């Protein structure tokens, strides 16, 4: 039985609290109100994708966000694991693997042909999990250009 379920508005406080810690770990600026707005957008608009939460009893201990898109290269619908986070207290219990299974099942049901994700280079455990689950590095760059002004948006670091 899955420990994941579709997120609802009542889960936003827990998701945002976890997100804040995760962003701080990686040195990104975090704005609570922006995170809440984004979470509610994904919860309330199924055309954007899905947000799932992992629960231990009544407590949210993780989440995975899947955003939908389109690609000629991937012959139609594609999706992106925008975020996958498991609380440190619950890591090593198979929840990351289960989060990917939930995301993949949702994507197959939604007619998605390819599922993408990005991972911080220093997160070796996550890289290992993703590779074991069949994700491959296509030796490409993920590049971003912000189209809306934001003082708080994550910014790339200089590469060496």
What positions do the PLM features span?
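Conserved beta-strand-loop-alpha-helix junction that forms the acyl-donor binding cleft
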Residues: 113-126, 144-149
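A short helix-loop-beta-strand connector motif used in the catalytic cores of GNAT acetyltransferases and
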Residues: 41-53, 80
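Conserved beta-strand in the GNAT
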Residues: 53, 59-68
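Conserved acetyl-CoA-binding loop-helix of GNAT-fold acetyltransferases
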Residues: 86, 92-105, 132
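A short beta-loop-alpha structural element at the N-terminal edge
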Residues: 3-17
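Glycine-rich acetyl-CoA-binding "A-motif" of GNAT/NAT acetyltransferases
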Residues: 48, 59-62, 125
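Conserved GNAT acetyl-CoA-binding A-motif
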Residues: 100, 107-118
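Conserved GNAT-fold acetyl-CoA-binding loop/helix
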Residues: 16-41
């Amino acid at each position: 039985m899955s420990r994941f379920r579709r997120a609802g508005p009542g889960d936003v406080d827990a998701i945002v609290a976890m997100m804040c810690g995760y962003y701080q770990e990686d040195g990104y600026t975090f704005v609570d109100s922006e995170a809440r707005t984004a979470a509610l957008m994904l919860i309330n608009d199924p055309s954007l994708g899905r947000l799932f939460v992992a629960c231990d009893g009544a407590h949210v201990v993780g989440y995975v966000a899947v955003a939908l898109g389109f690609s000629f290269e991937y012959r139609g619908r594609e999706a992106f694991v925008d975020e996958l986070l498991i609380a440190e207290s619950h890591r090593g219990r198979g929840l990351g693997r289960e989060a990917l299974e939930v995301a993949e099942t949702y994507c197959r049901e939604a007619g998605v042909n390819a599922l993408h994700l990005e991972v911080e280079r220093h997160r070796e455990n996550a890289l290992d999990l993703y590779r074991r689950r069949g994700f491959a590095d296509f030796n490409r760059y993920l590049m971003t250009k912000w189209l809306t002004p934001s003082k708080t948006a994550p910014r790339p670091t200089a590469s060496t």
